[in-house]
Amino acid sequence: MTIHHETRPTLNLIRLANGEGLELPAYESQGAAGMDLRAAVDGDAPLTLPPGKRALVPTGFIFEIPEGFEGQVRPRSGLAFKHGITCLNSPGTVDSDYRGEVKVLLANLGEEAFVIERGMRIAQMVIAPVTQARVAEITAASETARGAGGFGSTGV
C-alpha cells in the first residue's frame, strides 16, 4: 500500500522559548504511527521523577491539530519496559481547538528515581481522525446477544 503524501494532514506547530534548540517532533521510522515528543525541561536543571510520583513535562511546542483529528499522547514502550515510566490518562487527547503548550503527564511506576533531561524522548503522539456522534436519549436499549454482560463476560 502506498501512502500519498499530499493526502496526509499538515500539523502546524509553534516553537516556544523553552523549545529553542529541540528537534521537531518526528517519526523515527518509515512505518511509525507516532511522532516522538521531547522534554523541554531546563538544560541546567533536569527533572527527577521519584518512584510513585508524577510530573507534567513541557514539550516546548503548541500544536495546531487539523480539524477532524486529535493528537493521542501515548507512552514510549522502551521507557515503560526499562524504567517503569508511563503516561497517565493514556492516551491523552490533544483536541484540534487546543492552543496551549502540549505537556506530557509522566508517572514513575518503577523502583528507582528517573531523571528526565532536556531533549529526551518522553512520549509519542499519534494524529488520528475523530468522529463526533449525535447524542440521542432513548427509553430502552436494543436487544443484543451479549446484553448487559461486561468485564470478562465474553471470555478471558
Curated annotation (Swiss-Prot):
Residues that, per the record, bind substrate? 76-78, 89, 93-95, 103
* Record's keyword annotation contains Metal-binding: yes
A GO molecular function annotation here is: magnesium ion binding
Q: Where are the transmembrane segments?
A: none
Q: Could you tell me the Gene Ontology terms of the biological process aspect for this record? A: dUMP biosynthetic process; dUTP catabolic process
Q: Which Gene3D superfamilies match?
A: 2.70.40.10
Pfam family name, one:
dUTPase
Alphabetical keyword list: Hydrolase, Magnesium, Metal-binding, Nucleotide metabolism
Catalysed reaction(s) here are:
dUTP + H2O = dUMP + diphosphate + H(+)
Query: Where does the signal sequence lie?
Result: none
Q: In which pathway does it act?
A: Pyrimidine metabolism; dUMP biosynthesis; dUMP from dCTP (dUTP route): step 2/2
NCBIfam families in the cross-refs: dut (TIGR00576), PRK00601.1 (NF001862)
Q: Which PANTHER family match?
A: DEOXYURIDINE 5'-TRIPHOSPHATE NUCLEOTIDOHYDROLASE
Q: What does this protein do?
A: This enzyme is involved in nucleotide metabolism: it produces dUMP, the immediate precursor of thymidine nucleotides and it decreases the intracellular concentration of dUTP so that uracil cannot be incorporated into DNA.
The UniProt family comment states: Belongs to the dUTPase family.
This protein is called what? Deoxyuridine 5'-triphosphate nucleotidohydrolase
Q: What is the source species?
A: Rhizobium etli (strain CIAT 652)
Lineage of source species: Bacteria, Pseudomonadati, Pseudomonadota, Alphaproteobacteria, Hyphomicrobiales
